[in-house]
Amino acid sequence: PYARVAQVMGAMTAGEKDGLRVAVSRCWNLGSSSTDALRTTVTVAVSMDANGLPQIGSIRMLGYEGGTEAGAQIAFAAARRAIANCGREGFPLPPEKYDEWKEIEMVFNPEGMRLR
């Protein structure tokens, strides 16, 4: 699985974005999910605290592609768990750039995760 951090404003370096992508990707596991979920790409948004902790209640699905709504819900649940579990101690984000990453969009694609 792969995730892309979708909407982190320009001043963050490619390395900083990649660090967040890698951190979340380690926890993202669709496991033995349905075939439908395994072909579904979901875009997820999350609000972050200044210390790099995700605000769990803010995690929301913005949209999906490639599968059914049921498959998207399964993929979203896996994405939500990944953000919550790997973000338990905060993500490695530069505090001086908080205004740029306080709202993040991530694209979770079974073929690769990315930031947008």
For each feature predicted by the language model, list its residue ranges.
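A short, basic-hydrophobic beta/loop patch
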Residues: 77
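Short, small/polar residue-rich loop motifs at catalytic or cofactor-binding pockets
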Residues: 38-42
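Intrinsic-disorder/low-complexity signature in envelope-associated proteins
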Residues: 1-29, 33-34
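Short beta-strand
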Residues: 33-37, 97
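Short, surface-exposed charged micro-motifs
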Residues: 45
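Conserved "boundary/linchpin" sites in short secondary-structure elements
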Residues: 4, 22-29, 48-66, 80-116
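An anionic, turn-rich surface loop/hairpin at beta-sheet edges
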Residues: 67-73
